[in-house]
Amino acid sequence: MIIAAHICDRTIEIASVLGWLVAVAVIAGYARTPFGKYRGSLSEYSAVQLGTMAISGLLESMKIPPESGVVDGVYMGMVLQGGAGQAPARQAALGAGLPLKTPATTLNKVCGSSLKAVMIAASEIEAGRSDVLIAGGMESMTNAPMIARDASKGEPVEYSSLVSVMQHDGLRDAFSGESMGITGENIAIEEGVSRSDADGYALQSHSRASTAWRNGWMEKEAITMPNLSRDEGIRDNSTIEILSGLRPVFLDGGVVTAGNSSQVSDGAAALLICSEETAKREGWPIISRIIDFETSGVEPSRVMSAPIP
């Protein structure tokens, strides 16, 4: 049977099969690094180091001793894994002091990697397979290496062409060879998104982020770092005149510019996902209940129209 319970003006469906109740997954804690610009203030840190910092910051904020064994597992999204070493999520988990017995999994679903990590963690909680999990993502686009692909075929390294892992594995469609910027242009044409629409949206985003930092709203989630105290890519003084004066990057007369596109960033974030029962027992806040989620796929060249993840 399905029992409907009204909590915080939401309806949570709790399925009961042969007397077994599905747990309700909740977000009980969060922490992240400030996000750095490409080759910016966080360039000295690898993705694993950033992930370690986010996990450590989360545990500290929750007053959970890393060695306590409270955390049943870790899921971390990471797209640019080239050169990061085996099992980046496990590296970050152990780097944060979690016990050796703690399993960790690295996920690559491109833009949706860390959201997929949260979905999997929530599913484990609902199924009763885990009680407390950490889910998040980590990336250092700055430190994505160059690779000599031809060298593996016997070509001398000095004669091999170098390929950017950031571009090849992260910013280029594997099927059409188009850059993500072009796929954005395709959807802008298809959906009738104008240059002024994109610039206006970008200005609103920067303005809101700037206001949030100025009012101290972001300080509770961003951990303290020695060389970066806030997100580095926010343009506090941006105006519509500045944005509209930038040249399109990918198509003449196109929509996507350096001012209205997503930033190439370095950073990491982590959430504590647990059952509602556990949160209440431990006295942890119930920040959000994970009610449901879905995923789907579209034609690769139309990736910017896809839901994330």
Where are these regions (language model features)?
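Glycine- and Gly-Pro-enriched alpha-helical subdomains that act as flexible
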Residues: E276-P309
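Active-site-proximal alpha-helical scaffold in enzymes
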Residues: L107-E139, I182, A188-W217, A270-E277
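Conserved active-site "lid/cap" helical segment
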Residues: V22-A84, P88-A96, L100-P103, T183-R195, ...
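Flexible glycine-/small-residue-enriched beta->alpha junction loops
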Residues: V132-N186
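Beta-strand segments within the central parallel beta-sheet cores of soluble alpha/beta enzyme folds
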Residues: S68-G77, P103-N108, L133-G137, D197-Q204, ...
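Conserved catalytic cysteine-centered active-site region
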Residues: Y45, M78-D131, F175-M180, N237-Q263
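N-terminal extracellular/periplasmic Venus flytrap/periplasmic-binding protein-like
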Residues: R32-T33, E44-M53, S61-I64, S196-R281, ...
